[in-house]
Amino acid sequence: MARLGVNIDHVATIRQARGGAEPDPVAAAAIAELAGADGITIHLREDRRHIQDRDLRLLRQTIKTRLNLEMAATDEMVSIALSVKPDMCTLVPEKRQELTTEGGLDVRLHLDAIRGAVQKLQDGGLIVSLFIDPDTDQIKAADKSGADYIEIHTGAFAEASDWKAEQEELKKIENAIKLAGKLGLGVNAGHGLNYSNIRKVAALGGIEEYNIGHSIISKAVLVGLDRAVRDMVDLVKYS
């Protein structure tokens, strides 16, 4: 049965908009866990635009499920990860001008640097995933990097303009799942997944964990975080 990792970055985004202490993403994580989330995902960006070091530290101390830390493959972030010891580190690309992560890592282009970061993290006893597009060459490069998992970037599927484009993107995801399996890589997925489209990806099978944030927090504004998480848990686990 697939797992749901709830990304709470946007709780921190709301807090940072006023520069205060509320809403606290640490409290949000506790509510998400009680509602059935299998893990909590956060992205500690280099510019600290939403999640702060304090959040990461407290979440590591309080989370009862699993903590997935999204991070750039920089010396600073590797050092932080080795100190905090999340249950999984997901390496993601990062641009200061972007509103959210816009695409997958180019593992082919940056293979040496990514391989080095993966090795350091694994030497520290950490499990490493790479956030990549559902592209054959990128998956093969991820395997060469020594990573344990890939997280398939589902943004192109989520943003498909029509049925035909959506089916093409679903096929890419399906092929990516199969190739990763043959290479011995675990498979997670995320980006742009919501209450309307998650069933289509879940029907493919082969994905261990879905990391979903924006749609859950958006619904939580209207119905509460507990209900929003429970509804997504039902879709992920029983679709």
UniProtKB/Swiss-Prot annotation:
- Disulfide connectivity for this sequence is none
One term under GO cellular component: cytosol
Binding positions for 3-amino-2-oxopropyl phosphate per the UniProt entry: N7, R18, G192, G213, H214
This entry's Enzyme Commission designation comes to 2.6.99.2
The Swiss-Prot or TrEMBL record annotates one GO molecular function as: pyridoxine 5'-phosphate synthase activity
Report keywords, A-Z. Answer: Cytoplasm, Pyridoxine biosynthesis, Transferase
Cite the position(s) of the site with description Transition state stabilizer: E151
Q: What class of enzyme is it?
A: transferase
Please identify the protein, giving its name as recorded: Pyridoxine 5'-phosphate synthase
Q: Summarize subunit and interaction data from the UniProt record for this chain.
A: Homooctamer; tetramer of dimers.
Where are the catalytic residues? H43 (proton acceptor), E70 (proton acceptor), H191 (proton donor)
The GO annotation for biological process reads:
pyridoxine biosynthetic process
Gene designation: pdxJ
What does the UniProt entry say about where the protein is found? Cytoplasm
Q: Which reaction does it catalyse?
A: 3-amino-2-oxopropyl phosphate + 1-deoxy-D-xylulose 5-phosphate = pyridoxine 5'-phosphate + phosphate + 2 H2O + H(+)
Positions that bind 1-deoxy-D-xylulose 5-phosphate: D9, H10, R45, H50, T100
**What organism is the protein native to?**
Geotalea daltonii (strain DSM 22248 / JCM 15807 / FRC-32) (Geobacter daltonii)
The pathway to which it is assigned is:
Cofactor biosynthesis; pyridoxine 5'-phosphate biosynthesis; pyridoxine 5'-phosphate from D-erythrose 4-phosphate: step 5/5
Q: What does the function comment of this entry state?
A: Catalyzes the complicated ring closure reaction between the two acyclic compounds 1-deoxy-D-xylulose-5-phosphate (DXP) and 3-amino-2-oxopropyl phosphate (1-amino-acetone-3-phosphate or AAP) to form pyridoxine 5'-phosphate (PNP) and inorganic phosphate.
State the family it belongs to: Belongs to the PNP synthase family.
Pfam families, per the entry: PdxJ
InterPro entries named in the record: Aldolase_TIM, PyrdxlP_synth_PdxJ, Pyridoxine-5'_phos_synth
UniProt key word Transferase: yes
